[in-house]
Amino acid sequence: MEIPPEISHALSEIGFTKYEILTYWTLLVYGPSTAKEISTKSGIPYNRVYDTISSLKLRGFVTEIEGTPKVYAAYSPRIAFFRFKKELEDIMKKLEIELNNVKKEEQRPAIWRSRSFDEAIEMFRESLYSAKNEVIVVTPSEFFETIREDLIKTLERGVTVSLYIDKIPDLSEFKGKGNFFVRQFYKLNHLIGMTDGKEVVTIQNATFDSIGPPSFKSTYPEIIFSQYSLIIEIFKESTLEKEIIGNPKDIRFFAMFHAVDFVKNHLKNRNIYAEITGKNLESGRLETLTGRVVGYTLSLREAVNNIHLETENGVVKVGGMFAVIEDYESTEIKFIMG
């Protein structure tokens, strides 16, 4: 029997054999049938019908009706693929759980590209879910509703969200959810998400092409540096419009210019203590620093931003990603408000 080529191709793409495609299509078109009827209508050799039916039953696409002879019926595509999708999601969850249990070695950098907006948004969400300290989100306001729930879930995990947007939306739903900083910036075409300074997702020219914009996710340091530098330029021209501090004892940043801006706004009125994991630029070793924040440098023109931390070994300067002139470089900054 003739099957539309696009249907045959689509089913083969998800692992259906030629006989499985013919059998499922035959049952959809002609309704419940015996093995002999399936063979006659589909052209499948009779001795291959039963193993094909068994395979489709295991997949959840066909059911068996008891009787003499036995009759077989296809589940509708909506029901069959609902089951199939759930099965795939269960497998995906098991993979993610097992992957999280594996101690990962440091992986080489990579880049993943897409021309699908929906796929790019999934990459964006995946990046948000992996965050531990801070996510920076730059988005045109028309896409805010698409990611609203994802931002709330990120805040609820204790991760700081720093949002840049052209029009300030209703944020009442975000109160008490976590530490949320909203800055207004008007020149927005791209949607950018940067997570902990370790990976970045960029959906380019999203406002002009919301169906198939060129998009990528990358862990290459060079690309992260490029996008980080772009975000600093956006920061320079933005204004802080909303600050929600839901966890004053656990305020996390990876972007030092955000951490310094927070210190600038609060140090006069509050004591700020810090727990920082940073690389000693002299020895190259990772160290944990604790102490009271006693000062800061925020000079965007000279590209210098750091905090001055009073530790048991004296006052040290902690810079952010790609720090050079400071004592330490850090992307793991936690503030505790006194």
Swiss-Prot record:
Repressor keyword on record: yes
Transcription regulation found in the keyword field: yes
Disulfide bonds listed in the record: none
InterPro entries, per the entry: tran_reg_TrmB (IPR054965), TrmB-like (IPR051797), Tscrpt_reg_TrmB_C (IPR021586), Tscrpt_reg_TrmB_N (IPR002831), WH-like_DNA-bd_sf (IPR036388), WH_DNA-bd_sf (IPR036390)
Annotated residues for binding of sucrose: 303-305, 321-326
UniProt cross-references to Pfam families, sorted A to Z: Regulator_TrmB, TrmB
Entry's Gene Ontology molecular function annotations: DNA binding
Regions recorded as binding DNA: 33-54
Activity-regulation annotation: Repressor activity is regulated by binding of different sugars to TrmB. These sugars can act as inducers or corepressors. Binding of maltose and trehalose results in derepression of the malE operon, and binding of maltotriose, larger maltodextrins and, to a minor extent, sucrose results in derepression of the mdxE operon. In contrast, binding of glucose causes stronger repression of the malE and mdxE operons. Maltose may also act as a corepressor of the mdxE operon.
Keywords assigned by UniProt, alphabetized: DNA-binding, Repressor, Transcription, Transcription regulation
Physiological role: Inhibits transcription of the trehalose/maltose transport gene cluster (malE operon) and of the maltodextrin transport gene cluster (mdxE operon). Acts by binding to two different operator sequences in both promoters, preventing polymerase recruitment and transcription.
Family in the record: Belongs to the transcriptional regulator TrmB family.
Subunit (UniProt): Homodimer.
Comment on protein domains: Contains an N-terminal DNA-binding domain and a C-terminal sugar-binding domain.
Protein name as it appears in the record: HTH-type sugar sensing transcriptional regulator TrmB
Gene source species: Pyrococcus furiosus (strain ATCC 43587 / DSM 3638 / JCM 8422 / Vc1)
Gene designation per UniProt: trmB
